[in-house]
Amino acid sequence: MTKRGKGRLVIFLCAAVILVAAGSVRVKLHPPRPLHEQIADYMYHSRTDPKLEYLIEKYGDEFVATEYGSIQSTRFSDFYVYLEWSEAEQTYTDTYLVYLRKEELESILVPIAETIFGECKLFVYGYSTCPSNFGKDTTALELLSVSEEGPFVQIDIFTPKDPKQRNEDMQKLTEAFQEQGYFIYANIKYLSSETYNAVEETDYRHGVNIGRDAYKYFGSAIIAPDSFEWMRGDDGWCEGTG
C-alpha cells in the first residue's frame, strides 16, 4: 500500500471512530422514543397532515391540528373544520365555506326570519360538505342554491314567540325561502324568555342546554325551492317541557 493510500485509510478510520462516538453520545442524550409513541405519532400525522395541506392550499394558512387530530380554524377560534374524503374525486370536501360566508348569510336570512317570528336569533352553520369545485370566492347566494350535494347551509332559529302558530310560521318561512330559490336545512326552537335570553351568539351550542327540557317545541325541515320535507316524522314537531 502506498503512503497516500495508508494516509487515506487512517483518515477514514479516524472519521469512522468520530462518527460512532458521536452517535453513542447522541443516543445517550436523545434515546429513541418507545415504539408505541413512534406509531402513534405516525398515525397522527398520516391522518392530519393531508387535511391540513388540503385546507391551507384551498383557503390559506389559517388552520392548526389539535392534539386529538381535529382541524381547527385560527380565524374562527371555536370552529372545528368538518371534512369528508371523496373517493370519486380523490380529494377532500368541507363545510368551511359556510363559515367564511357566515356574516353575509346571516345578513340575508335574519331579516326574513324576523318578519315571521318577530324577536328571534338566527345562527348559520354548515350542513353538507361543499363540492370540491367550490372555493374561497364562492358567494353566499351560491351556497344557498340548489345542488345534488346540498343543502350546504343549516340554520338554527330561536324565538320566545308563542308556539301556537308554529305550523303557520313554518309555512311562511318555507314560502319565503322558496320564493328566493333557497335550499336550506332549518331548525326552529320555541323557547321560554329566560332560555331565549341565555342563548349566546357565539358558541351557543356549547354554552346553553337546549334539550327537551329547555324548549317548548322543536321542528326541523329541509326546504328546497320546489319541495318541503320534515325531518322528524309527519308532523315534524317535538314537544318539550321548557
Regions found by a protein language model. Name each.
Residues 10, 23-36, 145:
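N-terminal non-globular leader segments, chiefly Sec-dependent signal peptides
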Residues 58-85:
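Exposed beta-strand-loop-beta-strand "reactive/processing" segments of non-cytosolic proteins
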Residues 67-68, 87, 144-149:
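Short, ordered beta-strand-loop transition motifs
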Residues 93-171:
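Non-cytosolic head/periplasmic domains of membrane-anchored proteins
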Residues 139-242:
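Extracytoplasmic/periplasmic C-terminal soluble domains
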